Amino acid sequence: MAIHLYKTSTPSTRNGAVDSQVKSNPRNNLIYGQHHCGKGRNARGIITAGHRGGGHKRLYRKIDFRRNEKDISGRIVTIEYDPNRNAYICLIHYGDGEKRYILHPRGAIIGDTIVSGTEVPISMGNALPLTDMPLGTAIHNIEITLGKGGQLARAAGAVAKLIAKEGKSATLRLPSGEVRLISKNCSATVGQVGNVGVNQKSLGRAGSKCWLGKRPVVRGVVMNPVDHPHGGGEGRSPIGRKKPTTPWGYPALGRRSRKRNKYSDSLILRRRK
């Protein structure tokens, strides 16, 4: 990823660092409009996810997470920006005339060939079942349910590792540090998701953040008591509690948010860090 640093001409561009290499030119038959409503509200209009709203209009790119074009080689034609995710996407032209978008694997360039199937080479961008991969393979876009499509390790720079295979299950180390079991028949894509340097980007100004649909974050200690448990007091005052809390009074730091007694608890060998 090519990082472009702005010249110091105005305060808004003084600290900006953006990607100037990849552009967006989507195909009409692979995009469709989507209606954003709610902006972090539930059905009653109450805020359940803060700091969301506004943002530029987006067209959704239909991504092929299933990779079900079996044993048909495809060629990478373009590498494009996708406003709906921080990873890039590739337009693939398959030998049978099919055209689809996939996540951009790290290191893939225009003109490379990829293929999905059961007996395909272990090379970057190829998709195949976990049972056909050697131990230690770096993978992304991993299925949890057979045939449903990849659901794990899809963000920019994400990569998981196949560390064991036993019986009907394979053991994976996920990007979060979690170690869990997945059926060996589920498929995944070899390699790491591209755009690894996404964390090096600096928007430089608040307006660029608003384009992404992210609104300002306000500290609870400067709110009124009716709005936040930390609010109230005269002037600059402490939160008045032993530990920080959420706006709804739950512990804010270190509290586990995973739902208890989920069906997949038995598949997780080590929880995430």
Swiss-Prot record:
Presence of the UniProt keyword Protein transport in the record: no
Family listed: Belongs to the universal ribosomal protein uL2 family.
InterPro entries hit by this protein: NA-bd_OB-fold, Rib_uL2_dom2, Ribosomal_uL2, Ribosomal_uL2_bac/org-type, Ribosomal_uL2_C, Ribosomal_uL2_CS, Ribosomal_uL2_dom3, Ribosomal_uL2_RNA-bd_dom
One GO cellular component term: chloroplast
Subcellular location: Plastid, Chloroplast
Protein name according to UniProt: Large ribosomal subunit protein uL2cy
Key words, A-Z: Chloroplast, Plastid, Ribonucleoprotein, Ribosomal protein
Positions of the UniProt region annotated as Disordered: 1-22, 224-273
Molecular function GO terms recorded: rRNA binding; structural constituent of ribosome; transferase activity
UniProt-listed Pfam families: Ribosomal_L2 (PF00181), Ribosomal_L2_C (PF03947)
Protein's UniProt keywords contain Metal-binding: no
A GO biological process held by the record: mitochondrial translation
Subunit comment: Part of the 50S ribosomal subunit.
Domain of life: Eukaryota
